[in-house]
């Protein structure tokens, strides 16, 4: 054989070291003590705390305790001293019977370590029992012809002690015919025999009396005696003889009582009474005599009670056969009890660690239990198992002890409770099993933050809500339990329009209901962005955030506002001019209105609510343009009153009305003449303050008119047409009208002074408005126009209009009239489209409203640029490219600036040095300038 290699030697050495280590560990975990029997309760066996390397106080802290397997607890732990003491009186003979060594084994569990330590205690014997015979007297019959040397068995004494304290010797009282011989059996038992030394003579003595003494070797020595009565019989030649020297039989432990086991037969060659044999148990202990019965006539042995293999698996006894003549024979009977699988496994729970934290690491001990089967062989082999698909595993720790361990990290949110069934099954046929059911609770840890059902929330709230209104409820779910799942809601700190978010909304910390702390106005702001935080009450607390956007929905809470015509503060209405020669579709004026709402709440519709002459005028549904519906007739009244209603499309719709007064005349003098003939109620009285104001304005107007007339006279003295000058002067003497005088030149400036008489039929007052001078070059700079801030002064006239003579007027100059191209509208020469489509979205509508408001502001301030082209009122340059009539109702051109009858010329035409295409009057003036 080849020599082993170095690798093989190294491997064997490692294996040897491992085995030695395991043996050392096993030995180290086994603690041995000894204690004498019959000690009192509380006898100190050993210092177990020292042997476990623990302090006495740690026995309670670490929950150290004794675990045993169904046996009465013989020992206990003293937690104060850390010692192992007896729990009561210990009787070695009762505990271990005749075993040479009486060992008591149990386990000590250190629960916090989940570790078992083996404890072995040897109970030492003391000489507390004396040898004892089963009977106090014994009769022995011997035939007188017995040959010296014959031997007669004597009963044995029983001593439950062991060792030197057990039976050691027999002594026979002195006698000339008998002696004592002691035989030692295979099992070490001492068997006394009576030996005949001299022949007996019945005629000499019919009986002999002997005393047999049994003694042990203990200190003090104990003994007992039995009296032997020997009867000398007449001649009996043959003694009973058994067919077998030793009888052996096997029996199952589960046989019922009365089951026949065997028949021990002895034969006697004598006849008559000397040949009749009687049977009885000779050497049998008290327990065996209760389990078996013997027929004294037949020698049949049967069971008297049920046998139990686990209690005793082997029985040995002797049977005596005696004939009528007193001769005896003996035989030995050996009964083996065979095990059957009649015991189910026994499961004893040693420790149960419930509840267990869900974050317990893998391999955490949940259960420690003992599984034992009292049967033997395969019937006593136990296999334990648990149901499948659980997060646990079983491990056989040592001997019959098993540990239930966690196989993975537990999750309370998936399973908060486990119902575990442990099944212990033996290997017998058929197999028997035992089940135990345990309920394991899993305690929660705060390992889950609250979770919202959505990544973000969009909430819609109508404006003008009541304070304290419930807006929305956010819900966050925390799968943890108890305090770890109690969610607290809060809002992240933020600032909106300079104010803390907490002044606008609040949230209920328990329910997550969001409340409005103020009444929201869509026109102030339209949405709020906030962050909701959900925190649990665990330790440490976990939280999560969600974005919530609150949209304020517009409500129809604003009625349309009419920008033009603007109502004077005294409640009167303005007068619009319509020539009698106007054709159907003639643009008289335009009503401009806006709505501060949005969406369809701001979509406006115009309609003619009331008219003094039905059918004469029409109003554009979307544009607000007031046009003639038919040609004017002579029978039509001079003054026409129209009530135009503007209504939005909200629910419910809101509306506003404006009253328009339309004067039908071809020129301003005609208007004044016609209006002068109107009767004004005389019961209207003006205040003194109004009178003073009118007088002051009249004086200033006269001075200003004088200055203007003088200036014009000096400038126009070279004009060839004195008739035109006289006509103009006569016209100014009667009615102050607006003058627009332009001087051609590269750097010439034009100062325009405008006057406007606003005469109403409902008032005796006339309003004379003086705007500030407007300096502009021929290009009419938009910048300079935007700087104009009109100063309006009202002059009230106390005199009745009908009493004032009007100077006859010359034919109106075409320069003073509005051409069709210069009328307010989308186009100077085309009728408005009343069927335009509405904007398709809120953004377009809001942009359109912004443009209308901007245009209206410029109109109110008098700063609107007039050079943007005819019919656009200066809006085309800024807003023209975005929206046209073909797309949306033309709110951009709803800005109409009254009070001026100047010709709206094209700025581009002026820059080119070309006169605008006006009336004939312009052409004549231009020709005269060239001549000059």
Swiss-Prot record:
<protein>
    <recommendedName>
        <fullName>Protocadherin gamma-A9</fullName>
    </recommendedName>
</protein>
<feature type="glycosylation site" description="N-linked (GlcNAc...) asparagine">
    <location>
        <position position="389"/>
    </location>
</feature>
<feature type="glycosylation site" description="N-linked (GlcNAc...) asparagine">
    <location>
        <position position="419"/>
    </location>
</feature>
<dbReference type="InterPro" id="IPR002126">
    <property type="entry name" value="Cadherin-like_dom"/>
</dbReference>
<keyword id="KW-0812">Transmembrane</keyword>
<comment type="function">
    <text>Potential calcium-dependent cell-adhesion protein. May be involved in the establishment and maintenance of specific neuronal connections in the brain.</text>
</comment>
<feature type="signal peptide">
    <location>
        <begin position="1"/>
        <end position="28"/>
    </location>
</feature>
<feature type="transmembrane region" description="Helical">
    <location>
        <begin position="693"/>
        <end position="713"/>
    </location>
</feature>
<keyword id="KW-1133">Transmembrane helix</keyword>
<dbReference type="GO" id="GO:0007156">
    <property type="term" value="P:homophilic cell adhesion via plasma membrane adhesion molecules"/>
</dbReference>
<feature type="glycosylation site" description="N-linked (GlcNAc...) asparagine">
    <location>
        <position position="47"/>
    </location>
</feature>
<feature type="domain" description="Cadherin 3">
    <location>
        <begin position="243"/>
        <end position="347"/>
    </location>
</feature>
<dbReference type="InterPro" id="IPR013164">
    <property type="entry name" value="Cadherin_N"/>
</dbReference>
<feature type="domain" description="Cadherin 4">
    <location>
        <begin position="348"/>
        <end position="452"/>
    </location>
</feature>
<dbReference type="GO" id="GO:0005509">
    <property type="term" value="F:calcium ion binding"/>
</dbReference>
<keyword id="KW-0106">Calcium</keyword>
<dbReference type="Pfam" id="PF08266">
    <property type="entry name" value="Cadherin_2"/>
</dbReference>
<feature type="compositionally biased region" description="Basic residues">
    <location>
        <begin position="922"/>
        <end position="932"/>
    </location>
</feature>
<keyword id="KW-0732">Signal</keyword>
<dbReference type="Pfam" id="PF16492">
    <property type="entry name" value="Cadherin_C_2"/>
</dbReference>
<keyword id="KW-0472">Membrane</keyword>
<feature type="domain" description="Cadherin 1">
    <location>
        <begin position="29"/>
        <end position="133"/>
    </location>
</feature>
<feature type="glycosylation site" description="N-linked (GlcNAc...) asparagine">
    <location>
        <position position="127"/>
    </location>
</feature>
<dbReference type="GO" id="GO:0007399">
    <property type="term" value="P:nervous system development"/>
</dbReference>
<keyword id="KW-0325">Glycoprotein</keyword>
<dbReference type="InterPro" id="IPR020894">
    <property type="entry name" value="Cadherin_CS"/>
</dbReference>
<keyword id="KW-1003">Cell membrane</keyword>
<dbReference type="GO" id="GO:0005886">
    <property type="term" value="C:plasma membrane"/>
</dbReference>
<feature type="region of interest" description="Disordered">
    <location>
        <begin position="902"/>
        <end position="932"/>
    </location>
</feature>
<dbReference type="GO" id="GO:0007155">
    <property type="term" value="P:cell adhesion"/>
</dbReference>
<feature type="compositionally biased region" description="Polar residues">
    <location>
        <begin position="816"/>
        <end position="841"/>
    </location>
</feature>
<dbReference type="GO" id="GO:0003723">
    <property type="term" value="F:RNA binding"/>
</dbReference>
<dbReference type="InterPro" id="IPR032455">
    <property type="entry name" value="Cadherin_C"/>
</dbReference>
<feature type="domain" description="Cadherin 6">
    <location>
        <begin position="570"/>
        <end position="683"/>
    </location>
</feature>
<dbReference type="InterPro" id="IPR050174">
    <property type="entry name" value="Protocadherin/Cadherin-CA"/>
</dbReference>
<feature type="topological domain" description="Cytoplasmic">
    <location>
        <begin position="714"/>
        <end position="932"/>
    </location>
</feature>
<feature type="topological domain" description="Extracellular">
    <location>
        <begin position="29"/>
        <end position="692"/>
    </location>
</feature>
<feature type="domain" description="Cadherin 5">
    <location>
        <begin position="453"/>
        <end position="562"/>
    </location>
</feature>
<dbReference type="InterPro" id="IPR015919">
    <property type="entry name" value="Cadherin-like_sf"/>
</dbReference>
<feature type="glycosylation site" description="N-linked (GlcNAc...) asparagine">
    <location>
        <position position="545"/>
    </location>
</feature>
<dbReference type="Pfam" id="PF00028">
    <property type="entry name" value="Cadherin"/>
</dbReference>
<keyword id="KW-0677">Repeat</keyword>
């Amino acid at each position: 054989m080849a020599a082993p290699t170095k690798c093989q030697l190294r491997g064997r050495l490692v294996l040897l070291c491992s085995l030695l280590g395991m043996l050392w560990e096993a030995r180290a975990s086994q603690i041995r003590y000894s204690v004498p029997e019959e000690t009192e309760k509380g006898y100190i066996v050993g210092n177990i705390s020292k042997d476990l390397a623990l302090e006495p106080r740690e026995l309670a802290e670490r929950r150290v305790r004794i675990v045993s397997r169904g046996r009465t607890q013989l020992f206990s732990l003293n937690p104060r001293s850390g010692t192992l003491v007896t729990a009561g009186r210990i009787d070695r003979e009762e505990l271990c019977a005749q075993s040479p060594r009486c060992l008591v084994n149990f386990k000590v569990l250190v629960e916090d370590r989940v570790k078992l330590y083996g404890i072995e205690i040897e109970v030492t014997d003391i000489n507390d029992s004396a040898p004892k015979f089963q009977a106090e007297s014994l009769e022995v019959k011997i035939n007188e012809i017995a040959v010296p040397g014959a031997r007669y068995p004597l009963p044995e004494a029983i001593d439950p002690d062991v060792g030197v304290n057990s039976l050691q010797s027999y002594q026979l009282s002195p006698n000339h015919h008998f002696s004592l011989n002691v035989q030692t059996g295979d099992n070490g038992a001492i068997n006394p025999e009576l030996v005949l030394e001299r022949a007996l003579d019945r005629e000499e003595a019919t009986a002999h009396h002997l005393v047999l003494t049994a003694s042990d070797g203990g200190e003090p020595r104990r003994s007992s005696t039995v009296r032997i009565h020997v009867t000398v019989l007449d001649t009996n030649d043959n003694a009973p003889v058994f067919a077998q020297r030793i009888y052996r039989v096997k029996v199952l432990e589960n046989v019922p009582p009365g089951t026949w086991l065997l028949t021990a037969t002895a034969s006697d060659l004598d006849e008559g009474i000397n040949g009749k044999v009687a049977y009885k148990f000779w050497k049998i202990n008290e327990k065996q005599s209760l389990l078996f019965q013997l027929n004294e006539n037949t020698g049949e042995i049967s069971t008297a009670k049920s046998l139990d293999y686990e209690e005793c698996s082997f029985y040995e006894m002797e049977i005596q056969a005696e004939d009528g003549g007193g001769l005896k024979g003996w035989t030995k009977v050996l009964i083996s009890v065979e095990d059957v699988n009649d015991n189910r496994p026994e499961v004893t729970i040693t420790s149960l660690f419930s509840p267990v934290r869900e974050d317990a690491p893998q391999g955490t001990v949940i259960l420690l239990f003992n599984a034992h089967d009292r049967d033997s062989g395969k019937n006593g082999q136990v296999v334990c198992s648990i149901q499948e698909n659980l997060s646990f595993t079983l491990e056989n720790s040592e001997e019959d002890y098993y540990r239930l361990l966690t196989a993975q990290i537990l999750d309370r949110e998936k399973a908060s409770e486990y119902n575990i069934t442990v099944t212990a099954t033996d290997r017998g046929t058929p197999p028997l099993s035992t089940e135990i059911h345990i309920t394991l609770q899993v305690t929660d840890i705060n390992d889950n933050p609250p979770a919202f059902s959505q990544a973000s929330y969009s909430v819609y709230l109508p404006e003008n809500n009541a304070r304290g209104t419930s807006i929305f409820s956010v819900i966050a779910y925390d799968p943890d339990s108890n305090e770890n799942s109690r969610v607290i809601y809060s809002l992240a700190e933020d600032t909106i329009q300079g104010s803390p978010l907490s002044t606008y909304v609040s949230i209920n910390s328990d329910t997550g209901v969001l409340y409005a702390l103020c009444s929201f106005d869509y026109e102030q702001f339209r949405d709020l962005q906030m962050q909701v935080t959900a925190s649990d009450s665990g330790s440490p607390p976990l939280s999560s955030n969600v974005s919530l956007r609150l949209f304020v929905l517009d409500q129809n809470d604003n009625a349309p506002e009419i920008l033009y015509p603007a109502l004077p503060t005294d409640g009167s209405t303005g007068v619009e001019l319509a020539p009698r020669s106007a054709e159907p579709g003639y643009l008289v004026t335009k009503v401009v209105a806006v709505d501060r709402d949005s969406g369809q709440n701001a979509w406006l519709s115009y309609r003619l609510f009331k008219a003094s002459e039905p059918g004469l005028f029409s109003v554009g549904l979307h544009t607000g343009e007031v046009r003639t519906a038919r040609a004017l007739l002579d029978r039509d009244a001079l003054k026409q009153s129209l009530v135009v209603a503007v209504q939005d499309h909200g629910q419910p719709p809101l509306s506003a009305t404006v009253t328009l007064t339309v004067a039908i005349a071809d020129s301003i003098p005609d208007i004044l003449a016609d209006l002068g003939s109107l009767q004004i109620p005389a019961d209207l009285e003006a205040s003194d303050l109004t009178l003073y104001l009118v007088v002051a304005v009249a004086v200033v107007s006269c001075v200003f008119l004088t200055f203007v007339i003088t200036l014009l006279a000096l400038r126009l003295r070279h004009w060839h047409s004195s008739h035109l000058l006289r006509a103009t002067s006569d016209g100014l003497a009667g009615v102050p009208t607006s003058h627009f005088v332009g001087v051609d030149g590269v750097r010439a400036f034009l100062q325009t002074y405008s006057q406007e008489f606003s005469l109403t039929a409902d008032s005796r007052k006339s309003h004379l408005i003086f705007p500030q001078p407007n300096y502009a070059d021929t290009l009419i700079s938009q910048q300079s126009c935007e700087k104009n801030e009109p100063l309006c002064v009202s002059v009230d006239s106390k005199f009745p209009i009908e009493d004032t003579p009007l100077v006859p007027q010359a034919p109106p100059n075409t320069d003073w009239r509005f051409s069709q191209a210069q009328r307010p509208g989308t186009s100077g020469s085309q009728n408005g489209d009343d069927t335009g489509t509405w904007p398709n979205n809120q953004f377009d509508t809001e942009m359109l409203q912004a443009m209308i408001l901007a245009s209206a502001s410029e109109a109110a301030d008098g700063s609107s640029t007039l050079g943007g082209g005819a019919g656009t009122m200066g809006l085309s340059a800024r807003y023209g490219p975005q929206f046209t009539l073909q797309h949306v109702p033309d709110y951009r051109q709803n800005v109409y600036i009254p009070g001026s009858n100047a010709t709206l010329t094209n700025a581009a035409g002026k820059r080119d040095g070309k006169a605008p295409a006006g009336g004939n009057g312009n052409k004549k003036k231009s020709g005269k300038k060239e001549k000059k």
